[in-house]
Amino acid sequence: MSERETRGANEAIDFNDELRNRREKLAALRQQGVAFPNDFRRDHTSDQLHEEFDAKDNQELESLNIEVSVAGRMMTRRIMGKASFVTLQDVGGRIQLYVARDSLPEGVYNDQFKKWDLGDIIGARGTLFKTQTGELSIHCTELRLLTKALRPLPDKFHGLQDQEVRYRQRYLDLIANDKSRQTFVVRSKILAAIRQFMVARGFMEVETPMMQVIPGGASARPFITHHNALDLDMYLRIAPELYLKRLVVGGFERVFEINRNFRNEGISVRHNPEFTMMELYMAYADYHDLIELTESLFRTLAQEVLGTTKVTYGEHVFDFGKPFEKLTMREAIKKYRPETDMADLDNFDAAKALAESIGITVEKSWGLGRIVTEIFDEVAEAHLIQPTFITEYPAEVSPLARRNDVNPEITDRFEFFIGGREIGNGFSELNDAEDQAERFQEQVNAKAAGDDEAMFYDEDYVTALEYGLPPTAGLGIGIDRMIMLFTNSHTIRDVILFPAMRPQK
């Protein structure tokens, strides 16, 4: 047996011994009465204590004689004979407990407290003071074990480094890593701020079906399920777009939804099959209005959640206080591949040859517009580091967007990029029912030619358009990618609490 194998075997033995020891302690607790009490109440969290009392010195705290109660997980313990120091962690952070034998009821210190384990959840009551080093602490007069932890914290809780464990057992990650906890706190704040931003501008939050008979609103491969009572195959939605625009037809002129979409695609640092999107639709607006709204949204979120319009992501700093760059798709191709002959982008054969020369495999179902878009993706997208709007997307890759009045081969559409990745997609909506029917048919033809991501024909949506959709603009923003930016996270798994993972064998 190698040294590594020997060490691993010894660690397994130690773990099993500790597990058995903790279960024996729980068995003893059961014999004594209620093993999992639920009658302890706290009056402060750790962050509330720090915010309210950190500025006071020890003399002032002693004169005030402030009694508080807290509860949380015991993360560290230093036993020094008749007294100990404990670090207690709760939702707000950490607070130090000073536990002295003579300050507790008889027997509590030696017979109970010293037998507890790291990871146990405890309640404490006592008076506030500051140590000689100035650390706010609680001099405990009452200690109670509220939940016995049967499993030891990993690595004595010096940190959880195994990425697979972090994602599979997110509860351990949240216990172990301050950054992970803060990431999801920021996520929650951003979602709340988005809702406040939208409602303040007259938008109504709605909910639309997660299971659909016809998946629409995006080009993607859907998940399929079966409704037993209806004996009907259904699809987890890939986007809420068509239902939201039905609501605009019905008279709700400004609507938005923040919810999950599902796409049966690969997993990467940028992609999770289950992800969160915000989509919004506003009547009597065009894509220029959406560009202004998007800039304002990101600027507001940065200022309100982070306290600054400057956001650091890796080695880059994004200043959302400045106007964002705007380029057409063709301008971006020329900027990042200067040798491109722009005339090649107007001819199918020339564009196909150009695409193949830079490593793109051109599918039979692709037209000129799709090829130009793929060229843009290959040569320009990774360079769009600072906030940038790309406009003038080909109609072929924009089946739901309004055609441009001057050039019907392109649409009044933009995509929004930061850090070399797409964050949002918006456009003036196609509200010509006959044009929409033709584009749906083109998508059906593409699907028949082998494009698995082409859209289905949605007859009811065409019917809705026939009743009249007012001039409307719509925007979708990937919330997970947005959170990655605001938390300086470099994989989408770091911002989704429970990301998709291959089952362990």
Curated annotation (Swiss-Prot):
Broad class of the protein's primary localization: cytoplasm
Localisation: Cytoplasm
Enzyme class: ligase
PROSITE patterns (UniProt xref): AA_TRNA_LIGASE_II
The protein's Enzyme Commission number: 6.1.1.6
Binding residues for Mg(2+) 2: E422
Catalyzed reactions per annotation: tRNA(Lys) + L-lysine + ATP = L-lysyl-tRNA(Lys) + AMP + diphosphate
GO molecular function: ATP binding; lysine-tRNA ligase activity; magnesium ion binding; tRNA binding
Co-factor remark: Binds 3 Mg(2+) ions per subunit.
Modified residues (N6-acetyllysine): K114, K156
GO biological process, one term: lysyl-tRNA aminoacylation
Family indicated by similarity: Belongs to the class-II aminoacyl-tRNA synthetase family.
Subunit-structure text: Homodimer.
Entry protein name: Lysine--tRNA ligase, heat inducible
Gene name linked to the record: lysU
